[in-house]
UniProtKB/Swiss-Prot annotation:
One of its GO terms (biological process) is regulation of DNA replication. Transmembrane segments: none annotated. Pfam families: PCNA_C, PCNA_N. This is DNA polymerase sliding clamp. Belongs to the PCNA family. It comes from Halobacterium salinarum (strain ATCC 700922 / JCM 11081 / NRC-1) (Halobacterium halobium). Homotrimer. The subunits circularize to form a toroid; DNA passes through its center. Replication factor C (RFC) is required to load the toroid on the DNA. It comes from the Archaea.
Length: 247
């Protein structure tokens, strides 16, 4: 059983956070939380999302599992104006999701969850560096790096106590340094890893510029990015595998 009413903004923000990595996913409909965990086809980027029942105007669920085509659901949600309410109800017999938006009614065929890629186990890494940064600074770094390269290095300099971003192209380079007074928080530890800029660009699309983003970094280790959505009623974690640099 699943029946809910949610604002268009909250639903769109939730779907966007996942669709930057995958086209389809499993959605767990627990009695107090909607949750999604998925990995992209190349097993490079992962997403773990929880949206509390309190993020909804109303929410009833009993532990079901559904599979959805994210692009189709996003298209439907995109028909709603900002602030409008969207009604969702699962028909368990037909395995279809009924969606109502201000008089418009849609019936979305669901996907067999067993046909969707297995959900990843996101490792509990004890990474040495922790950085809290504003979403707008991540956006600035990614945008600048994209002008010169297709990969980006993120790290922490423990000697100078700062977080840095490097991007090296064939002819041009980008370097950004942020000291503790330019960050929300910095727990310095040895960290330097190279990442695909394409993945970070996609993740960046879903990160609000006003969000506080917590980064966990290591030396040639995956990066974890944590941030809240839906007025802190939802939480997203991205994990991105590094590009291993040859000596």
């Amino acid at each position: 059983m699943f029946k809910a009413i949610v604002s268009a903004d909250t639903l769109q923000e939730t779907l966007d956070s996942v669709s930057v990595l995958v086209d389809e996913c499993k959605i767990h409909l627990d009695d107090d939380t909607l949750s999604i965990r998925a990995v992209d086809p190349a097993s490079v980027g992962m997403v773990d999302l929880d949206l509390a029942a309190t993020a909804f105007e109303s929410y009833e669920a009993d532990g079901g599992l559904i599979g959805v085509n994210l692009s189709r659901l996003e298209d439907i949600a995109g028909m709603a104006d900002a602030g409008q309410l969207i009604q969702l109800e699962l028909d368990e017999e037909t395995r279809k999701l009924h969606i109502q938006i201000d008089g418009l009614e849609y019936t979305l065929a669901l996907i067999d969850p067993d046909s969707i890629r297995q959900e990843p186990d996101i490792p509990d890494l004890d990474l040495p560096a922790h950085v809290a940064i504003e979403g707008r600074d991540i956006d600035r770094a990614v945008t600048a790096a994209d002008m010169v390269s297709d990969h980006i290095a993120l790290g922490v300099d423990t000697g100078d106590d700062l977080f840095y971003v490097n991007a090296e192209g064939d002819t041009d380079d980008v370097h950004l340094e942020l000291a503790p007074d330019q960050l929300i928080d910095l727990d310095a530890g040895d960290a330097h890893s190279l990442f695909s800029l394409d993945y970070l660009k996609d993740m960046n699309k879903a990160i609000p510029t006003t969000a506080e983003v917590e980064l966990e970094l290591g030396d040639e280790f995956p990066i974890k990015l944590h941030f809240d959505i839906a007025d802190a009623q939802g939480h997203v974690t991205y994990m991105l595998a590094p590009r291993i640099q040859s000596n």
